[in-house]
């Protein structure tokens, strides 16, 4: 795998099976420009398009992370949910891995009330409040907390609307994409040959079902974000050190003046 966080090698995509699309009879004509051909009635994706699109998307999220912006990872189907949660947590980004609740973006103010309730219940569980309740009351609150955690746990620390969303399987996550577009939030999407690329700002033509391929996509996206955050830290450190160097020069320049004054 390439060391560059904003470069997706074609070899990695080939090995992961990213070029295998869906059966030809299920294709979406809007994806025609990204299709190389067909083999055994399976569409083959032109990975030259995939590499170019992926590198553009990686560069974009890398830049967002360098500005301390947030990218919401979205993948609720079985092939994606596990790695979405794992890599989003590794990159310190919000995620939705269970089910997209209508209004997660467009009704954020109302949703924030549920998030506050979740945090309140978590605090009660930690500070011993649950232990003071009857078994039935404690069980009810525990179940309520677990339900909220499953639905909202990945976005409870998002703090506001994300600056972009990254989606695995754009058809499966159509509601999330629609909400993002309504709010002008850029969408990065893995788009298979059977999917509709409309409303996706960064179209990455690739297989969206193979677990190995999905793991590759999400991991590389997280890598690019982590690299962007590290770059921001380096820049912040350099900026903090610069005044200190100037102070030293000022002190050195002032020393002869003090001597001449004597």
Curated annotation (Swiss-Prot):
GO terms for cellular component: cytosolic small ribosomal subunit. One of its GO terms (biological process) is translation. The keyword Endoplasmic reticulum does not apply. Residues 236-262 are annotated as: Disordered. Keywords: Ribonucleoprotein, Ribosomal protein. The keyword tRNA processing does not apply. Coiled coil: none annotated. GO terms for molecular function: structural constituent of ribosome. It comes from the Bacteria. Belongs to the universal ribosomal protein uS2 family. This is Small ribosomal subunit protein uS2. It comes from Psychrobacter sp. (strain PRwf-1).
